[in-house]
């Protein structure tokens, strides 16, 4: 009897799918977040896979992640983006997180079209990005996200 129960449990464990990355999209962020990345990516002219890579890095796809004053999928700080939120009509930082983060990225791309500079500025601020850029260095954060974005693009046939 114990052997039969153990066999059933083993089979159940083996046959139960493990949820990691979506087989279709190769990312573990929610379908809703992926749809937002596509929608806002198209609206702002930013690669959706870049937005997905940022979300994976910043919050591991957890919509209600918090780290100090940074919140949500893209770890946006209400303190630093209050005016942006008002302009965009965002009243809940968790609900409008991808929109606010994408709008900020678009602003950074308008200032400097170098992907690594933009990612360093997003993560550490413009002054930090300028110092790193002038020293001809890229942060591990920027390189990691750029690589993951490129990987997602390849997986999506781009």
Which stretches of residues belong to each language-model region?
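Secreted/periplasmic proteins that engage bacterial cell-wall peptidoglycan
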Residues: 33, 46-71, 76
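Non-catalytic cell-wall polysaccharide-engagement segments
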Residues: 2-36, 40-44, 61-62, 79-158
């Amino acid at each position: 009897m114990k052997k039969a129960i153990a066999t059933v449990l083993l089979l159940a464990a083996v046959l139960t799918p493990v949820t990691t990355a979506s087989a279709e999209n190769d990312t573990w962020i929610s379908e809703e977040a992926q749809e937002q990345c596509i929608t806002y990516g198209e609206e702002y002219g930013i690669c959706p896979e870049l937005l997905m890579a940022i979300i994976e890095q910043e919050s591991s796809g957890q919509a209600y992640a918090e780290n100090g004053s940074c919140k949500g999928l893209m770890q946006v700080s209400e303190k630093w983006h209050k005016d942006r939120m008002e302009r965009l009509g965002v009243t809940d930082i968790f609900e409008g997180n991808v929109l606010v983060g994408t709008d900020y990225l678009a602003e950074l791309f308008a200032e400097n079209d170098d992907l690594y500079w933009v990612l360093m500025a997003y993560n550490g601020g413009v002054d930090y990005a300028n110092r790193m850029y002038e020293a001809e260095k890229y942060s591990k954060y920027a390189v990691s996200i750029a690589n993951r974005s490129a990987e997602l693009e390849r997986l999506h046939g781009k």
